[in-house]
């Protein structure tokens, strides 16, 4: 049970037009100034580290190149971006198989992003028809799980996969990956202030949310007339994690372990949880080009820490996006 609890904490830890400029009143505003047909290319890398006691090892890694193309531009309504994966490498065979299956049937398009005139994200959508092949995707991932875990009964994964691979969750995964790149668009920030905020992180298993609190600010020393460097940090403590974690674990157990003693599982979980120490911390550092509003560099890091019965563990996830230099100027 300790392994299940630690694993889930890590999973849960995994959703007006004009040129932006430095203002004369010591503020900075991030605004999209995109034109129809504009296209930027980004190199991305994501690495997940597992921590057990004092040991840290690479659990999985992904990398590739994506493009973001403006396919609709309206000064009053906003913009639509098409996000496409041009190259992709996955160390996880299941993720690789899923990506290959989606690319085979739907091409390179990952999702579409609709924004307001400032570049503030309004909604995400996935390629038409992707949600209709849910059962095919579930079967493909189930087959990959059979190969990776030959000693396990593959049917135990099916309820979990049916919860995970849905049109809503495919949109949520795209939202979690790409929305932070544009989270500061539309904001006008003073150079000398830190802004406090609260964020309610939704669950994909229940209707619950997890509250995280933190602050963001402009790094004045690294900001000039060409670009702005923005930073954010947010955390969730044990009391904020408790209802979120417990409700989600119960949902997973009820779906994946129907033949097991539910009362005993719940009792064991409560005992472990009462003594557990846990925390989640997110950090974001982003550089945005002021003249166009395109992100130049982006770093996301999530630290998950867990101590159960003196056994320490956790996970670090680090994701970066870097604009390909020769494509910065349109």
Feature map (PLM): residue ranges:
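Signature of exported/secreted
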Residues: 21-330
């Amino acid at each position: 049970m300790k392994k299940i609890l630690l694993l889930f904490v890590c999973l849960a830890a995994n959703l007006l037009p004009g040129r932006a400029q430095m203002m004369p009143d010591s503020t900075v505003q991030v605004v999209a100034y995109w034109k129809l047909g504009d296209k930027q290319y980004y190199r991305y890398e994501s690495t997940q580290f597992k921590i057990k006691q004092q040991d840290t090892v690479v659990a999985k890694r992904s990398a590739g190149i994506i493009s973001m193309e403006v396919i609709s531009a309206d000064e009053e309504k906003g913009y639509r971006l098409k996000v496409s994966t041009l190259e992709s490498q996955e160390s996880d065979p299941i993720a690789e198989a899923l990506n290959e299956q989606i690319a085979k049937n739907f091409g390179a398009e990952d999702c579409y992003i609709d924004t307001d005139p400032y570049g503030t994200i309004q909604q995400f959508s996935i390629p038409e028809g992707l949600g209709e092949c849910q059962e095919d995707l579930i079967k493909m991932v189930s087959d990959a799980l059979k190969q990776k875990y030959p000693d396990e009964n593959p049917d135990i994964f099916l309820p979990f996969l049916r919860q995970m691979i849905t049109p809503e969750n495919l949109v949520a995964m795209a939202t979690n990956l790409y929305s932070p790149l544009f989270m500061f668009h539309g904001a006008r920030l003073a150079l000398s202030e830190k802004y406090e905020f609260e964020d309610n992180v939704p669950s994909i298993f229940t209707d619950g949310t997890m509250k995280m609190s933190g602050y963001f600010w402009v790094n004045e020393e690294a900001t000039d007339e060409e670009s702005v460097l923005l930073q954010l940090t947010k955390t969730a403590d044990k009391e904020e994690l408790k209802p979120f974690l417990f409700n989600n674990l119960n949902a997973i157990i009820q779906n994946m372990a129907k033949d097991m003693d539910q009362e005993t599982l719940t009792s064991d979980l409560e005992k472990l949880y009462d003594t557990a120490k846990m925390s989640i911390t997110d950090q974001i550092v982003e550089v945005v080009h002021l003249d166009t509003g395109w992100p130049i560099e982006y770093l996301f890091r999530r630290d998950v820490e867990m101590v159960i019965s003196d056994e320490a563990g956790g996970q670090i996830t680090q994701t970066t996006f870097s604009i390909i230099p020769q494509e910065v100027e349109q």
